[in-house]
Structures are given as structure tokens and as C-alpha cells.
Amino acid sequence: MPTLRFPFHLANHNKDAAINILIIFISIGSIIFNVNYFHTTIVKNGQIINQPTNAFQSDFSLAALWRNENHAGVKDANPVAVNQETPKLSIALNGIVLTSNDETSFVLINEGSEQKRYSLNEALESAPGTFIRKINKTSVVFETHGHYEKVTLHPGLPDIIKQPDSESQNVLADYIIATPIRDGEQIYGLRLNPRKGLNAFTTSLLQPGDIALRINNLSLTHPDEVSQALSLLLTQQSAQFTIRRNGVPRLINVSVGELTGMNGLRHERTQ
């Protein structure tokens, strides 16, 4: 079978044509790539930043949020009050017995015409939503629906008490400060001192710093009886104190009349 022979110059011509076609396709592809690249390139502040479209939208949203937070001219007509003032408690704190154990500490509170005793985390009978959260030496912290309020022992008592025309309305606690004395969890008496600005003890047999072991028949080493003794001072005009002074127990009768200098009688007996 005869073999067809092509001229050599024709073969070279076809090879050059194929190379030219390939170059054309490469050029077209490069042009398309460059068009797409510059289409998705953002020129900002003289810098070329490549980022997808959704990233630009996110950046714009953050900028809009910043403008709304800092430069918005429209304010909420009905803003929500964060801290609303809670009415103050209408109670009278009459006494505090503080021990090293929070569970044995308690307070005496006047609610209406009655005096109540409360321990830590107890709710008030007159206000079931109010709880005792902390008992301090001279104050108590109450919580009412997340609002905390501190009530101080005898907050309205002036430094100097004016003497009334008659002492008939005054009680022993108007002239005597009784502070529980503790040794760890054990209470072993009440330390007695005159109220600031008063010279009440100069007209009685009491001396500043005296330690009372008993008041009437109440032992001041038991928390329950200490509570009753503090209540007695808040309601009575006279009482018998068992005082330990220089290691010697003494019985001293004390009255409002003696503390005000209106009564010259003094009663003391050494046990």
C-alpha cells in the first residue's frame, strides 16, 4: 500500500498554528482572571484590601452599630429605671447579741407594739419578704427583694439627751449602754456604760465598765435570758443588777430617778 507523504513545510506550519492558538487561549484566560480580581478588590484609604463581599457587609454593620451607640440623636422616651429606690424599713432595732458563731447571734426588733427576736436569715413577721442577712456589732443588714438596707442600733439617739420635766416616760436604756461580753461563743455578762454625754453614773452606784452578771433574776450567761434582760432595760425604770467589781459580786438597785439625780437613795449590798 502506498504511503502518503506530506511536505515538511506543511507540518511546520500546522505546529506554529497550534502554538499560536494556545497562546491566544492563555491570554484570554489571563484577561478574565484580572477582570474578576479587580472586580472583587476594594481600594480604601490608599490601601488595597482583598476581602469577600460578606466581610464588607459585616464591617459596615459594625460601623452602623457604633454610630447608633454613640451618635444617635433619638433617645428612648421610656427608659427602664435600673435602680429604683426601695422604701426604708419601718422597724426599730433594740438590741444585738453577736457571737463568733452566726447561728447563735440574734437581734431584738420592735414590730408594732411587740418585740421580736430574730436570728440570721430569718424573715420578719411584719414583712415576710425581708430577711436578716448580716448581724454586726452595732448594725443589722436586711434584704428585701434584692435591695439591701443597713439599720443601726439606736440611730436617732442624740449624743446628749435633754432631761424632760418628768422622768416617768424614760427607761433604763435611755441612760445605760449594755454590751454583751463574749469569750468565743460563750456570753458571760453585759458591760455597762453611760450613754455618751451623760453623767448618769455619777448619781448612782454604777461605775463605767461594770460587768453585770445578772439583772433581776435573769442570768446573763444564757442567750435567751440576755435577750430578756435587754428587753427589760428597754421597758423598765428600775432593776436590780448583780455586778462583779474587783472580783466581788455586788447587788445594786438602779432606777431612772437615781440616774437622773432626782432620787438621792442608793441601794448597794455586797454578797
Curated annotation (Swiss-Prot):
A single cellular component GO annotation: plasma membrane
Q: Which Gene3D superfamilies match?
A: 2.30.30.830, 2.30.42.10
UniProt topological domain (Cytoplasmic) ranges: 1-17
Report the transmembrane regions from the record: 18-38
**Localization, UniProt:** Cell inner membrane
Q: So which stretches are on the Periplasmic side?
A: 39-271
Superkingdom of source: Bacteria
User: Does Translocase count among this protein's keywords?
Assistant: no
Q: What induces it?
A: Silenced by the DNA-binding protein H-NS under standard growth conditions.
Q: Which UniProt keywords apply?
A: Cell inner membrane, Cell membrane, Membrane, Protein transport, Transmembrane, Transmembrane helix, Transport
For membrane topology, the record states:
Single-pass membrane protein
Q: Its GO biological process terms?
A: protein secretion by the type II secretion system
Concerning Pfam families, the annotation shows: T2SSC (PF11356)
InterPro entries, A to Z: PDZ_sf, T2SS_GspC_N, T2SS_protein-GspC
Task: Tell me yes or no: is Heme among this UniProt entry's keywords.
Answer: no
Please list the coiled coil stretches: none
NCBIfam families listed in its UniProt record: typeII_sec_gspC
Function description: Involved in a type II secretion system (T2SS, formerly general secretion pathway, GSP) for the export of proteins.
More about this protein: Part of a cryptic operon that encodes proteins involved in type II secretion machinery in other organisms, but is not expressed in strain K12.
Name the protein family: Belongs to the GSP C family.
The molecule here is called Putative type II secretion system protein C
